[in-house]
Amino acid sequence: MVETVHPKNDRLVWIDLEMTGLELDRHVIVEVAALITDADLNIIGEGVDLVVHATPEQLAEMDDFVTTMHTSSGLLEEIKASTVSLQEAEDAVLALIAQHCDPEHPAPLAGNSIATDRSFIRAQMPRLDKALHYRMVDVSSLKELSRRWAPRVYFNQPDKGMAHRALADIVESIRELDYYRRAWLISDPTTEDAEDAKANATASYQQFLQ
């Protein structure tokens, strides 16, 4: 008997942040975007795209590179004009998750090179951190593996823009994962093939696990 999985159990929560820098002790989140996808990477709902206000003192912590980046993208002026607090942005993402995901089965966080984003979420949006599964889907892992195992896939990946805005970065990450799925992760092996692969992998590394 095939078990039917409720669609909300298969959701991915895509989040991207823009910050004033990468150091947790002195930098802050200034833009939050979130989208939900189903198991086939279809985007569900409208998502969240919010610029968070930062004080002049917080903005003064940006180095020249980040200042130039956020100025070129138009984000810096939006930060100054924003009246949205980080708590309000966190509330909006939590509401999105509550609407589209199963609270009994927290969805993984997904994105590109998301370790830093998760660190900022954990430190500055702890309620959101608790609403996410501890597992993460990092598209950059497939990028690194394709470079080593499937160079044609690696060199033909979709071009990425340089907008440095949170929502655009999320959409590009979803598109990139969809590309890897279509170009590389396309086979659905038979049970026999999967069992053979398991046996071969087990045999190859058994000596290191004794």
Curated annotation (Swiss-Prot):
Location of the Exonuclease domain: 12-177
Keywords recorded for this protein, A-Z: Cytoplasm, Exonuclease, Hydrolase, Nuclease
EC category: hydrolase
Location of the active site: 134
This protein's record includes keyword Hydrolase: yes
Recorded GO CC terms: cytoplasm
Major site of localization recorded for this protein: cytoplasm
Spans traversing the lipid bilayer: none
Disulphide bonds in the chain: none
SMART domains: EXOIII
Domain of life: Bacteria
PANTHER family assigned to the protein according to its UniProt record, in alphabetical order: OLIGORIBONUCLEASE, MITOCHONDRIAL
Entry similarity comment: Belongs to the oligoribonuclease family.
NCBIfam families: PRK05359.1
Name of this chain's protein: Oligoribonuclease
Origin species: Corynebacterium diphtheriae (strain ATCC 700971 / NCTC 13129 / Biotype gravis)
